[in-house]
Amino acid sequence: MTKTVALLDYGSGNLRSAQRALEHVGAEVIVTSDPDICTNADGLLVPGVGAFDACMKGLRGVFGHRIIGTRLAGGRPVMGICVGMQILFDEGIEHGIQTRGCGEWSGRVERLQARILPHMGWNTVEKQPGSEMFAGLSEDERYYFVHTYGVRDWTLVTDDLTTPPLVTWAVHENDRFVAAVENGALWATQFHPEKSGDAGAQLLRNWINHI
């Protein structure tokens, strides 16, 4: 059965490359900001490039933060890519500007401390045991990153009632940051799977199978 993915159009992100990548792995893709379509599709993909503040303004302009919250409250799959991952956290700080995010995860997006920025190009990630996102992918696979900001320090609070997110990390120079998160219906990547060749295609295929 073909899965339908709503690709959220809120003025940020390379929609065409994400659409092609999803169609390549068998999804039916609708590029839209319509709340009903975004809420009822099998999956919702949230892209994002540029500044955290600008992305949040665009997202709120189409009520995207509410769409994400509504889907997750009902256990319906959402995936964020690049800044589309960053805005899922509590806040972002860029150029001294503090901006509130969607708040699905605690944590702060901040400037990386590496010498060479942006972090642009191919890099490996620290694949976690039991990962559905990276199923069928080896630990030496490389993924395409392009970013200056990220989540560098994330302390997970655990209790007996909830399952903590499965966090995949990456390192640029000596700076360690969150590369991907799996948290039930909510998945996200700092890298661009749609630009990551066969490995990225397999990851997107895993997400389509997950939804």
Curated annotation (Swiss-Prot):
Pathway linked to the protein: Amino-acid biosynthesis; L-histidine biosynthesis; L-histidine from 5-phospho-alpha-D-ribose 1-diphosphate: step 5/9
GO terms, biological process: L-histidine biosynthetic process
Cite the Glutamine amidotransferase type-1 domain residue spans from the record: 4-211
Q: Where in the cell is it found?
A: Cytoplasm
Q: Which residues does the entry assign to the active site, renumbered to this chain?
A: 82 (nucleophile), 192, 194
* Any Gene Ontology CC annotation: cytoplasm
What this chain does, per the entry, is described as: IGPS catalyzes the conversion of PRFAR and glutamine to IGP, AICAR and glutamate. The HisH subunit catalyzes the hydrolysis of glutamine to glutamate and ammonia as part of the synthesis of IGP and AICAR. The resulting ammonia molecule is channeled to the active site of HisF.
Q: What is this protein called?
A: Imidazole glycerol phosphate synthase subunit HisH
Gene that encodes the chain: hisH
